[in-house]
């Protein structure tokens, strides 16, 4: 588990069309760095691993960023930060080098591919900042959310991936679009078939490259390893406690993962042991009723992230079920064609079902203590250029 520290809460300098944090901003849930002493105490109590997140963490003052990263260096943290990349300046670069910060940048490609996030001018500046950080020896990874705009300009996106690889990026996380508002639904949402076609194109384009790409790497692990090291969306997340995320706001209070926060209210984080109740229910609920009963890939998908559930109700499976099933099935077929041994689907499902009905202290998800979002998952998305989890 990794702690996400939000030094400016969910404040951001951009207004991305599809941002899942918008309900929190609409509800007025902003905070400022008022009590870093309390924040440090919360980080230590949570295990001492943390990354800076937002909103946009680079809205914090240089003084505060220095204090936070120096604290991370002091306790032996793998310092990391997730940013949109627009505000990066030479002082930030010096700070990142000083404290060995792994920087994750959220960008959906060049030009029109990224127009749901920023203007063409800002996108060019972000790309320049990425290249500049890489040239200074800073480890950079990318989150690329796949949607109608970059799917429409897929050739530009693939060239961008190639350019970023040549510049030194070794870790890419291709996100499935989370649809939480009408504008996203109307302008960016892909059909299941279109979404599958876009991800499949990226899969085949990157397959032979010397880079790590999610979700493809995770899916291969889920299909070939009994206890794989995978990111949070594959872990059977409890939406009440979100065990992969111990968010800490600027006042030092613990919060849950923002992806399940559909009302914009940061409820006080539960101290309860994570429950597998959602997955016990999905396992026995028919497909027509929003469940996953008898799905051959339930052990791998687990109904996916509760933040993407049908009707925003985490009791349901993901609304993107057809897309994920198709992608998993394609990758399984490719593994078989390549002669890679894959798990027996029936046995894998039986193992997973046994695990979710075990006593809480013996329940096992496939999260393997993955620092949330990274190395390399769904939120914080920085990496150390290593393909293995951090020690």
Provide a role label for each language-model segment.
Residues 1-34:
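Canonical Radical SAM [4Fe-4S] cluster-binding loop centered on the CxxxCxxC motif
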Residues 15, 19-22, 260, 298, ...:
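Cys/His-rich metal-chelating microdomains
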Residues 25, 36-51, 60-179, 184-191:
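Radical SAM/AdoMet-radical enzyme domain recognition
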Residues 194-228, 253-303:
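C-terminal accessory region of radical SAM enzymes
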Residues 226-236:
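Short, basic/aromatic recognition patches
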Residues 235-243:
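Short, small/polar residue-rich loop motifs at catalytic or cofactor-binding pockets
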Residues 248-251:
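Short, acidic, Ser/Thr-enriched surface-loop or helix-capping motifs
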Residues 287-391:
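Radical SAM enzyme core and accessory elements
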